[in-house]
Amino acid sequence: MQRSFDDLGTPLSDVTFVVLDLETTGGSPSACAITEIGALKFKGGQCLGTFQTLVNPGVRLPREIVYLTGITEAMVGPAPLIEAVLPTFVEFIGDAVIVGHNVRFDLGFLRENLKRLGYRPLTNRFVDTCSLARRLVRDEVPNCKLSTLARHFRTSADPCHRAFDDAAATGEVFHSLLERATGLGVLALDDLIALPTTAAHPQVAKLRWVASLPRKPGVYLFRDGAGRVLYVGKASDLRRRVRSYFSSDDRRKIGPLLREAQSLDHIVCVNDLEAVSYTHLTLPTKRIV
């Protein structure tokens, strides 16, 4: 029977992403201000729109920020204040998944300004390209700075501490990392968001097993190279449960099972009670977990 998208999770090709970058007067969201916003909206690899504006921070720019970004007092002086920019930018983001390099920095400034101006907080899901890169290409690059990754993936956009250019470079890096992730069986949004922890597992190549599992109750069976059952488990959400094996910190117990396992089978059940009954039908020859 063909599974629905709800069973598998939202396919990445159906997800709208907004890749963003902010320039600011410093590192503290509560004490510093936004000077520039740049963002691009993508779905299915296609750019749907862009957002770009300077922002008058309402304070003098620190000398080191002018030197770093090239943004000057003359540039931000005639620019709109953040209270004039933020409503339009929030509308641009909509319910998209937010992507950024060290994205928590950008989200911190957005949340602080939304709170100060009396807007509802952002509840969007987000993906950090820095965390993804640490898991997917850490052996290929000396570090995971945006400039390093841009050179590694030969992006056409050059990150230069200007918001739109950095957002464009981040978007190209993100799509290159997506290609790596799909090679591990990451085809749905939940799996992508979980990847920074699951990809650290030494048996990460077997993570592609997760892609075939529905989000339904059932039984899963780890098998060795000869097809013998190593372990039978039940789950209310097969996909989430098996994926958790790759992010578990208890490597002493989980590690031996994943090292020996060479395949994974599953049986979809109507509910948890039916799943319990199935676990008694096929007993493991070796109960590792």
Question: Could you tell me what each predicted segment is?
Answer:
Residues 95-98, 227-230, 264:
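Short active-site oxyanion
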Residues 220-252:
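GIY-YIG-like beta-to-alpha core
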Residues 162-173:
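Acidic, divalent-metal-coordinating active-site segment for phosphoryl/phosphodiester hydrolysis
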Residues 24-26, 105, 131, 169, ...:
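Short, glycine/acidic-enriched loop or turn micro-motifs at the edges of active sites
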Residues 127-143:
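Short alpha-helix plus adjacent loop in nuclease-associated cores
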Residues 1-123, 139-161:
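Conserved non-catalytic scaffold segment of RNase H-like nuclease domains
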Residues 1-9, 152, 175-226:
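Acidic two-metal-ion nuclease catalytic site recognized across multiple nuclease folds
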Residues 279-285:
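Conserved small/polar residues in nucleotide/adenosyl-binding loops
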